[in-house]
């Protein structure tokens, strides 16, 4: 599970999940600089996901002790990430970065790359992404929308996850 670091409580949540569910693989998302990266690692993140990249951030990630999935939104980002050795990337925001047609075009010239699109991925378009040979996963909040979380409607979240699996033959 990815804990996005967007609130002051996020790091404590990451640590609490690690403490309460030690077998769960928990990572940190929305990593944007070296200090946030260090805090995420100190709180037990087992993988790192960034929303975007800069040369400075990629340099900080080079020494990261856990797997990293850097975020990209265009061909320049993609090529910069590959210069640092990355072949598995997050496309964010996918819907504003060209979506499935963009990833199809990228596959024609860089078939060795794999993507996890997020941002604008929904139950109505997830299959379009997952049908592409260079998409290994998708991410989206439709499976755990904020209303369900606030209401502690775990059944609705479970049902949405099961439906996503069934629709995509996972």
For the regions a protein language model found, what residue spans apply to each?
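Glycine-rich, proline-tolerant flexible connector loops at the mouths of alpha/beta enzymes
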Residues: 1-21, 142-152
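Catalytic beta/alpha-barrel core
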Residues: 1-7, 24-32, 37, 45-53, ...
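Generic hydrophobic/aromatic pocket-lining and core-packing "Φ" positions
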Residues: 14, 37, 58, 78, ...
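Generic structural signal for hydrophobic
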Residues: 17, 40, 61, 81, ...
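Short beta-strand/loop segments at the ligand-binding rim of alpha/beta enzyme cores
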Residues: 19-28, 45-46, 61-69, 109-117
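Catalytic cores of alpha/beta
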Residues: 33-43, 76-84, 121-137
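Glycine-rich phosphate-binding active-site loops on the catalytic face of alpha/beta enzymes
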Residues: 47-57, 90-99, 134-156
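C-terminal helical cap(s) of enzyme catalytic domains, especially alpha/beta-barrels
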Residues: 60-66, 147-170
């Amino acid at each position: 599970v990815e804990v996005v670091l967007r609130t002051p409580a996020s790091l404590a949540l990451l640590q609490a999940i690690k403490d309460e569910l030690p077998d769960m693989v928990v990572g940190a998302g929305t990593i944007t600089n070296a200090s946030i990266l260090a805090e995420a690692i100190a709180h037990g993140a087992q993988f790192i996901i960034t929303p975007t990249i800069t040369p400075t951030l990629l340099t900080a990630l080079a020494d990261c002790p856990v797997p990293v999935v850097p975020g990209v939104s265009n061909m320049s980002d993609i090529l910069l990430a590959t210069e640092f050795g990355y072949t598995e990337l997050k496309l964010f925001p996918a819907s504003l970065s060209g979506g499935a047609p963009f990833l199809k075009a990228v596959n024609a010239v860089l078939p060795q790359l794999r993507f996890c699109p997020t941002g604008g991925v929904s139950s109505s378009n997830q299959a379009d992404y997952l049908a592409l040979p260079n998409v290994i996963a998708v991410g989206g909040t439709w499976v755990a929308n904020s209303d369900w979380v606030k209401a502690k409607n775990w059944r609705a979240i479970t049902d949405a996850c099961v439906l996503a699996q069934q629709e995509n033959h996972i």
